[in-house]
């Protein structure tokens, strides 16, 4: 079983750790976070406002974080090149600070003895992999990879199924996206666009996202054919993608439902879901799929122009894919 280090014990760091423990597919052996001490880690891992109590045991013992009886080494280094991952037995490192997202910055982990680094965010220059879409293109010469974004993980499997069956001429994506940690609780200054700094609980905030363009990196045939934007809305978790696209081959909406369901039951099982129920966002809190197609929410204008809707738990679904990507990479060693 691959031994994993986690850098940054924020939303994704903690949920990747939960996903690792729950799945039993990888073993977390080390965590680095300079801003959270050991006892605080115990508390933050145990209690979660969005995903509830951790259903297991967690405690601090002999300077280590012990989850379900497994001791995890704790580091508190600000500089990733100083983290002694090898000493803790960590072979793969999940880079989940959101700060070290380039090849050069994430590469600092290799100095501490990590063999591979998985960036849990989009990267400007690291190769991006989306499970179920292009993970087969991974080869073991790559030391640093990106698991792309939660939104790309939702959109890409759906876009792949539609493109493989009907051909996407062009498309626009909108993600109606839950609040994330970078937003403000009340109006404040923003480092990027001014409106990004407006109160998250009070507003629907138009925002940029590279998620749709990134699909062109994981599905090269769609490069330049998709772009998109986001609305940040006052919900704590679970987001939804609206893909509006023009199809090359004519298709009835029932044809689209059929091929998506076939993919969800077959090659993309566990990654792409399918539902005909009258669901709302809360119904996907804690869902481990990358994307769940909402058959009842989509609409067709005609046989060539459709709006498709797919839900995702932007925290937990994504964290499960980080684990799956590491398992896949380990199978190629």
Swiss-Prot record:
**Chain positions recorded as NAD(+) binding sites:** 11-12, 33, 78, 120, 314
Residue positions, PTM S-nitrosocysteine? 150
Q: Catalytic site residues?
A: 150 (nucleophile)
Molecular function terms, GO-annotated = aspartic-type endopeptidase inhibitor activity; disordered domain specific binding; glyceraldehyde-3-phosphate dehydrogenase (NAD+) (phosphorylating) activity; identical protein binding; microtubule binding; NAD binding; NADP binding; peptidyl-cysteine S-nitrosylase activity
Q: In which pathway does it act?
A: Carbohydrate degradation; glycolysis; pyruvate from D-glyceraldehyde 3-phosphate: step 1/5
Which InterPro entries does this one have? GlycerAld/Erythrose_P_DH (IPR020831), GlycerAld_3-P_DH_AS (IPR020830), GlycerAld_3-P_DH_cat (IPR020829), GlycerAld_3-P_DH_NAD(P)-bd (IPR020828), Glyceraldehyde-3-P_DH_1 (IPR006424), NAD(P)-bd_dom_sf (IPR036291)
Top-level taxonomic group: Eukaryota
Under PROSITE patterns, the record lists: GAPDH
Respond yes or no to whether keyword Oxidoreductase is given for this record. Answer: yes
Q: In chain numbering, where does the site feature Activates thiol group during catalysis fall?
A: 177
Q: Name one GO cellular component term.
A: membrane
Keyword annotations of the record: Apoptosis, Cytoplasm, Cytoskeleton, Glycolysis, NAD, Nucleus, Oxidoreductase, S-nitrosylation, Transferase
- PTM note: S-nitrosylation of Cys-150 leads to translocation to the nucleus.
What is its biological role?
Has both glyceraldehyde-3-phosphate dehydrogenase and nitrosylase activities, thereby playing a role in glycolysis and nuclear functions, respectively. Glyceraldehyde-3-phosphate dehydrogenase is a key enzyme in glycolysis that catalyzes the first step of the pathway by converting D-glyceraldehyde 3-phosphate (G3P) into 3-phospho-D-glyceroyl phosphate. Participates in nuclear events including transcription, RNA transport, DNA replication and apoptosis.
By sequence similarity, the record places it as follows: Belongs to the glyceraldehyde-3-phosphate dehydrogenase family.
Q: What is this protein called?
A: Glyceraldehyde-3-phosphate dehydrogenase
Give the originating organism: Gallus gallus
Lineage of source species: Eukaryota, Metazoa, Chordata, Craniata, Vertebrata
